[in-house]
């Protein structure tokens, strides 16, 4: 179950208002870091609760016409055996919104995430999948893993973190999920008056960098290393660009994708939403000089670096474009999920001339919203024998899984990784193979 999956409650929140406290039995975990509860027929998404508990829930959002109300567990009447004292003093109702599950033991956090992945695929794709969320190497206690942290700055120039679904800032003197090198920069002791936020990056190669926003005139470039069984290399990345925040994530994901796709010499491969070229470069080494790899990315901070990261592989090409634009997919005309686009009337876009008409392999690594129906249709039209889908949102993966099935691609393998311990976030890597034309 995910937020918004329940029918609209007549009259919105009914008799529940912000600040009300009610005692409820807690049901299953929901996608988004909540658990589901009900009070007199009203659906509640309750943070800081665990399945099977009885808690006192304080309503935090109750809007007219909303399908559910949001709440925080501010008291626990009957506790789950998996409940623990959060290690961070800033975790809990009304405090920092960065972590969702610090009140659960780490193994149970992964059970909750596993339940979410299975439920999303069942409900949105009609598939019953036997998958378990796996731990990544390192950070055995789920702390000290986050190598990139964005701190907000308050009116007094102090760095801190924001509350859940709020612009309100919580001043902090530590962040337990941050890599210790992030905190060693002294970012939380400095005066950042005049800045909106401060980014701190602790790369795998070299010293941490601190980037005030908007104060930085030139954003530093850092080096990130991948040291895997199937691929090793170093990458230039903008300190404000995208790179996986868990130190073991990039290596694990590249090895997993290569293992699933099994590239062959001479293959043509597409890396869609390519970032700085992580998967493109790994594929280029596998397909060799007789193969071809095309990386598609729109963020100029990433494409500049991708071209440098791929420079040693003449068989690669970086296409600077949004993936939908590269395929000639019309932009949506109204706000909505990428899977429910409404094409601009009368607007026709040309497919990018450097996209190959066919491909042997495709890597899809879309943003949280997913690839969407139209992009999936274009990917399927390439006729690739295999598609690897790297997903940071299980709901988007499930929707796109259904779209791929419509075009003859079946889910053949799925792995899920706890790349963000203490939070509700996770990463999935799925393999799809063409089963019909």
Question: What do the predicted segments below correspond to?
Answer:
Residues 2-364, 369-371, 375, 383:
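Accessory RNA-recognition modules of RNA-modification enzymes
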Residues 377-381, 385-431:
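C-terminal substrate-binding/active-site "lid" region of AdoMet-derived donor-dependent transferases
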Residues 433-436:
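Rossmann-like AdoMet/SAM-dependent catalytic core
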